[in-house]
Amino acid sequence: MTGFRVAPGGVQELYNVNPDLTTLGKIIGGGLPVGAYGGKKEIMNLLAPEGPVYQAGTLSGNPLAMSAGLTVLNMLEKDVYIKLEEISKTIEKGWNQNIIETKTKAHIARVGSMMTLFFSDKNEINNYEDALELDTDRYAKYFKHMLDMGVYLPPSQYECLFLS
């Protein structure tokens, strides 16, 4: 979910990470069912025909998905990410303002255009134990209220709201 949502080079670019392997999902096929992977030369050389690991797929290189993916990737210019960041900051600011005004015990987690609202006494949710303490009933009520107002949020605070 982080392939191209936050930067042209994904979270790898954002956090300056150079992984051994990278996987990409639907975006690489313009939303069509396809995936891709890549990695360091010494790992990728293990794949056939150079290496002993055979890899194949029914839809590998599907022309429709590749064409759609190329079209989307060509559209993802830097200004798209700047605009998404501006909109995301506006939503985060509004949520925070509402949290303060209503004295709600909640926390917003956001990276680029991905965000979620946690109902919790904690200022940050960092691990599984923190997540176990989330007020899921409160989120369910909030979700229903927002839906009634025409705002579509993820049905669980364990899911992420995507603007991208």
Task: Name every feature range the model reports, one short phrase each.
Residues 1-164:
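Conserved N-terminal phosphate-binding loop of PLP-dependent enzymes in the Aspartate aminotransferase
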